[in-house]
Amino acid sequence: MIYTNNRESVFAHGAVIRECFPELTDQTIKLAEEAMKGMLVLPGTGPELYFVGNPPKWTENPVNDNEYTFHLNRMHHLKTLAEAYGLTGNLTYAQKAIEELSDWIDHVHAPSLYDEQGNLAPLHFDGLSPWRALEVGIRGYRTWPLIIELLADTPCFTEEFQQKLYQSVQLHCKILYEISPLLWPKADHNHYLMENLGLMALSCLFPEMPDSAKYLAHSQQELDRCMEAQCTPCGGQIEGSPSYHNGCVFWFSLRLVFARKFHLTVPEHYTEQLKKMFIHSVHATRACGGNFPWGDSHIAEKETMALAATACYMAFEDPFYLQTALYFYPPKTLMNDIRDNLWRIPDIRHLKEIMDDAVTAPIRPDLPLLAWQKDLNQVYLRTSWDKEAISLMTACRTPVQNLHAHIDAGGFDLTAFGETLVTDPAIYTYKDDENRRHFKSSFWHNCLTVNWKNMWEYKGSWAYGPQKEGYIRSVTAGDRMTAIISFHKNYEPAETTRILALIDQQFVIV
């Protein structure tokens, strides 16, 4: 038995989406038409559409970028096809989605959960594979549930297909239950958060599945652990990257969305910590909009505070979050995140009313101008919450928490007059090539370097050499000056100290 919508409610919801958000409807149908032809934009393809196969060649990596294979096997385009069916009633979209999902189940087989000695083999699910545990989790929470709910009542969803899908869902759950805890025993990575969301969503969607109750209980326990391990007392996500922080706000929020739908409770300490995470998202936003792009962060194109606001609106049904985001971002930015979640939001008309009101009455933040995130060794500083204000961010935390960090101890990002003045390079690619090496190196950051050397060895996209101690030594705020002092020993015997000082609310001295 699957917990799904029926066809009438799917079409009713789709009709309201078409009425309230016609431009988003058109975008979804455009993407669906491209997917019908096997044409997608994926990592490594640039901004251009790329033919992935018809059906897709799931296991190939034609552009030599591992993220291409990962993203293709997350099946976002099948979710889009299912949404296009819900918007139009056109069964060709449903048929295409089910044909491709069926093809994947038939031809992309999971590695064994066990090694030759009969022990669980987590490394089988931690490499370039459609069955990497993260992709298992993302299919579980982000794409398969909506594909199933939107298409389960169509003629395409045959008993034969349902049986093979059911078996694959069981395997997904077993991997997430047995393997993921071995990959992330400390629960201290965003992957583990998504993997447990996948386990939660699938166990809720298939309540009569053997071990469903066990899987659900495990997911709730581990999501609590994720919040405890990944969110610092100051509200920041431990990886120290604003993009991943905003992503985690979205993922932590989805637990509340699923809990409301399936009548589950979430501990109060979890929801209160999530609200603190949104405040951190606001601090991590430049005065002129966009993330302070520390580490593997994007600036403005995705995973900004707009995503965190959309997520918290879905979690708490409070317009405050959307109103705050619209102070920094144009409505189009929020709409990109809203479009991806329209089928998770029950009251579309109410959302439309809130967005219309928020556009005309955004909320300017009423928060401190200085935020020293001591657990992350990060500092956010601005002269006001005006968009023309001086705003800067600096950080110094070595050894790094994980490899989304760059080789940039004591670096900084600075904006003023509504413009970026000194930028952190942000993320460019995950592909292990010269671009990745440059974008992570000290030489492409606003850092002090010694003897033309990196602060520590860059071994590859996901490998560094050892690092030495580095931290924010002090932050002092007076009537005329705020000074931030960072310190690290990565150039021993030299010791590196940097002072960033905001003077008279008018200029910055380095």
Question: For each predicted feature, which ranges?
Answer:
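Active-site rim segments in enzyme catalytic domains, especially the processed small/beta chain
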Residues: D408-R473
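Glycine-rich phosphate/pyrophosphate-binding beta-alpha loops
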Residues: C396-A409, I427-D432, N490-A494
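Aromatic-lined, polymer-binding surfaces characteristic
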Residues: P55, N64-N291, S297-H298
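Short alpha-helical hairpin
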Residues: M39-T59, L72
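Carbohydrate-active enzyme catalytic cores, enriched for enzymes
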Residues: E239, S243-V422, Y471-I472, T476-G478, ...
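Acidic, contiguous internal or C-terminal segments within carbohydrate-active enzymes
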Residues: A477, T482-V510
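Short, flexible loop/turn elements at secondary-structure junctions
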Residues: T383-W385, T398, L448, W452, ...
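Extreme N-terminal leader/anchor segments
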Residues: M1-G44
